[in-house]
């Protein structure tokens, strides 16, 4: 088992029926987050999630801390959080497919990371978390301020919020689509500072701002559908097909 940049389970020499895992990987497609390797079989996900994690991991200390990952997907980041020293990781995501993808690996790694198939609005806890992550979730919310408020209430008094989101120079809420996505609201950095400080976060710091490139989000054998390239203008890769600025993402740490 390796929880490094490619989350890896097993060696192909350990198994007799090589087709079983090929069928599992194919049945559970599309794979959005990764990369993984399962008994020698690479799972090449749409997102190079290892690149995002590189932008985050040096900016937050997870050693001995309890972690909640909201909108966790298939748990790729949760395994990386455990590698970084988290004492426990709980993920929530409403997609049953992602929960099943996680289960495929968890049966070999162990139950160090739990993923619950529920939405944030339905999630309640007895013990708050030291660190709460929300990555790639905020701009999909109909009420982004309420999302931030809900996250803040899941933290210990000295807890840390890790927010990763699309950003725009000014708030962007297209009537139609943005990069083919419906119902998005993309905040500005100023919006995020204001909303987080209003919730009582005294230390809000932008740690990274990055243009999302087609080397990081793309179609693969394990996610064969259209991806970022098809959402960008054929004449100008710095614009979406709708004429908006192409995706730029920020990492914000608030405490």
What kind of feature is each model-predicted range?
Residues 130-144:
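A short SAM/SAH-binding and catalytic strip from SAM-dependent methyltransferases
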Residues 145-160:
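A short glycine-rich, Lys/Arg-flanked "PGG" loop and its adjoining helix->strand segment in the class I
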Residues 165-183:
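Short, glycine-/aromatic-enriched active-site segment of Class I SAM-dependent methyltransferases
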Residues 184-200:
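Short alpha-helix
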